[in-house]
Amino acid sequence: MARAAKSAVVLCMDVGLAMSHSNQGKESPFEQAKKVMMLFLQRQVFAESKDEIAVVLYGTDTTDNALAREDQYENISVHRHLMLPDFDLLEQIENVVEPGSVQADFLDALIVSMDLLQKETLGKKYTRLHIAVFSDLSSPFSVDQLEVIIANLKKAEITLQFFLPFSVDEEEFGGSSNNRGNAGSSDRGCGPGKGLSDQQKEGIEMVRKIMFSLDGEEGLSEVFTFRDSLERLSIFKKIERRPMPWPCQLTVGSSLSIRIVGYKSVTEEKVKKTWTHIDAKTHKKEDIKKETVYCLNNDEETEVEKDDTIQGFRYGSDIVPFSKVDQEQMKYKSEGKCFAVLGFTKSSMVLSNQFVGNQVIRMFAPSDDEAASVALSALIHALDEMDMVAIVRYVYDRRSNPQVGVAFPHIKDKYECLVYVQLPFMEDIRQYLFSSLKNNKKFTPTESQNSAIDSLIDSMSLIYDDGETKEDLFKTSKLPNPQFQRLFQCLQHKALNPESPLPPIDQHLLDMLETPVEVKEACMAPLATVKACFPLQEATKRKEVKTADEIFTKKTDEPDAKKLKEDDEGFSLLRLADGNVTSVGSVNPDQDFQALLRQKNTDFKHVSDQLIKRIYECLDVKQTQYYMKSILCIKTFREEAIKLSQVRLFNDFLQLLKQKVDGSALMEFWDIIVQEEISLITSSESKGSSVTPEEAKQFLAQKEEKVEEAAMMEDEGDVDDLLDMM
C-alpha cells in the first residue's frame, strides 16, 4: 500500500522591531502574522495531517541557526525543526514567540529556511517542499545572492508563499481599485505612518521579482494579505482520508463477471478523537483505574466472574439465555465479497425516499484491466441509454450481512462508473396512514393560497438562473460541519487557556448557516402575500368533556352546607368505583375503560393503549368466550372514540388488528368482526374521519383477487414488482 503523501513546510516569520508597530486602534503586523500562523497550525493539528512543520524566526535578539558564522546570518533562529505539529507548538507560538528589538535580512532568513529543508528532508520522501514567509517587508536586505536564491529554489523544487499586511498588486499599489489574484485586498497603514515606507516599497519590488521568476505571470497568486488569509483559514481543515479501494467481481448471472474497484464517495464523517476520563487534579489518564464487577441480584450481592455470565435475550417477560456459541451459530455465514446483479429495472421505479444506509460507493474498472474497462463501460452506457438501473446484492466481506441496493450509471467527461446506494428490506419500511386533506373541505386551499405558496417556493430557490448561467447559492458540499468546527474551536481554546471559559461560536460560522442574502431579499414579497392569505387566529381552548352527571347537576344559590348535604346524598357507588379505577384491568376491561374516561384530565391515548393491550391478551388465549370479550372491548372503544372525536386512534388500531389476524389462526375472530359489522369510523359518523362509507364496507370485504395477484407476482419474480412491493 502506498504511503500517505506528506509535505515539509517551513514557516518563516519576521519578528523584527518594525513588526510590532501599528496605527492607533489597529493590530500590529506581528499580531496578525501570529494569528495566521495559529490558524494554519490548528487546521493541520485537527486534520491529523502528516505534513511536517518547522518554524524559523528572523529579527530575534539571539542567533540560532546552522549557517551562522561571525557576522553572517545573524538574528535568525530556528525555533522548531521539522516534525508533526502539535499543541505544544501552538502554545509556543501563542505565548513564547515575542517581537525582537532588531532587524534581520529576510533573504538571509530565506536561505536558512532552504538549508533547513534540504538537510532535514535528505533521505526522506516528501511530495512537496514549501516555505511561507510572514513579514511587513520593513527589514533591510542585500540583493547580492538573489539570483542564486532563485536558482536554488527552482533546482530544489521548493514552492514559496508570502503573507503581507498589504497588497503587492501593481495596479492597486498605484491607486487602482482593480483587485487581482489573492493579493487584492489592501490592509495598508500598518507602519508608524500613513502609506508604505521606502524600504517596504523596495521589499514589494523584491517580492514581485522573486515570484515572477518562480511562477511567471501567476506568481502573485501566491502572495496573500493577512486579512484574506484570516478569512480563508478561519475554517478548520477537514480530516484527510486516503481512498481505500474495495476490489470485487461484478457478476451478472453465472457466466458474466467483471472486475471492479469500489471507493466510498459519500459517508458520514465522525470525530476520530474520543473522550476519555482523566484525573481532575493531575490531568493524567493513568491515574484513573476502572473496574467492572458482576454481582448477583440478591441481598448479599454475590460477586461472580465475567466468564460465569452469558448474554440473555428478553422475550416478553422471560429471558432466553444465549451463549457465545449460540450467537456464532446464529450469525449469517457469507461466502465473502459480493456485488451480484439480481436484475434490472427502470430508474423511475427506484425512488429517492427508499435510499438507506450511510454511504455511497462508486464502482470503477481497474486501471490496469482493459477488458474490464470495456465491459463495464458497455454496461454503464447500456443502462444510461435504456434509462435502467441494476438491483444488486452487496456484501462487503465474509463477516458482513448482505445488502440489497441499486447501481446507477454515472457518466462524466473524465470518467464513468456505477454508483451504489443501499435499499431497504421489508422490515426497514415504516407504513403510516394519515387522513387525507382533500376529503375535508375545511382544509382545501383556495387558488390564491396555492399561488402564494408556489411563489414562495420559487422565490426561495437556491439556484440562481438568469437563462445563461446557473449558480448554486448554497453549496452544501462546501459547507463545513458546524459540530466539528465548534468542537475544534473549543478544544483549541481549552488546550491554550485551560482555566478560561469557552469562547462564543465564531460569527463567520453562524453566517455560513444563514439563508443566502439573495434568497432573503427575493422571498420578502411572497412571504407578505402568504401572511395575508393565511391569517393567524387565536386558538380557543377546547371545552372539557363533561359527564351526564355533571351536565344535569342542579346549580342553585343554596347555602354551602345544604349543597354539601345534597352532594353526599347523590354520591353513587358507580362514581365511587370510577374513582378507584386506576388502570384497565383484565376482568371487565370495557367498564374500566369507560370509568377511566369519566375521570377528569384523562389521556385518551394512554387509556386506549391499555385497552388494546387487554384485547390482544384475550386474543392470545384463542377461545370463543375471550373472542366475545374482545369484541365487547372493541365496540366500547369505537363508541367512545366517536364521542370524544378520537377517530384516528381507533381506525389505526383496527387496521393494525386486521394485519395481525390476516392469514393467522385468528381468522375465526375476524369473521365475528365481519358478522358484527365493526368497521372503520366513517366521515358520516364523525367529522374527524376521512373514511367514506364505501371504504368502510370494502375494509370488511374479502380480498381474494389481491391474494391471487400476489401469488402471480411471486411466481413471476420480476424486479419491477419487487420494488413495487417494497
UniProtKB/Swiss-Prot annotation:
Protein origin, superkingdom: Eukaryota
Tissue spec: Expressed at high levels in oocyte and testis.
GO biological process annotation, one example: telomere maintenance
Subcellular location, record wording: Nucleus
Region ranges (Disordered): 175-198
Keyword field contains Nucleotide-binding: yes
GO MF entries: ATP binding; damaged DNA binding; DNA helicase activity; double-stranded DNA binding; hydrolase activity; telomeric DNA binding
Domain named Ku: residues: 253-449
EC number: 3.6.4.-
Main location per the UniProt record: nucleus
Spans annotated as Leucine-zipper: 137-164
Record's compositionally biased regions (Low complexity): 175-186
One CC-aspect GO term: Ku70:Ku80 complex
Locus of motif EEXXXDL motif: 714-722
Family statement drawn from the similarity comment of this UniProt entry: Belongs to the ku80 family.
Comment, domains: The VWFA domain interacts with the KBM (Ku-binding motif) found in a number of DNA repair proteins. The N-terminal and C-terminal regions are not required for binding to DNA or for degradation of the protein with only the central region being required for these processes.
Role according to the record: Single-stranded DNA-dependent ATP-dependent helicase that plays a key role in DNA non-homologous end joining (NHEJ).
Subunit structure: Heterodimer composed of xrcc5/Ku80 and xrcc6/Ku70.
Full protein name: X-ray repair cross-complementing protein 5
Gene: xrcc5.L
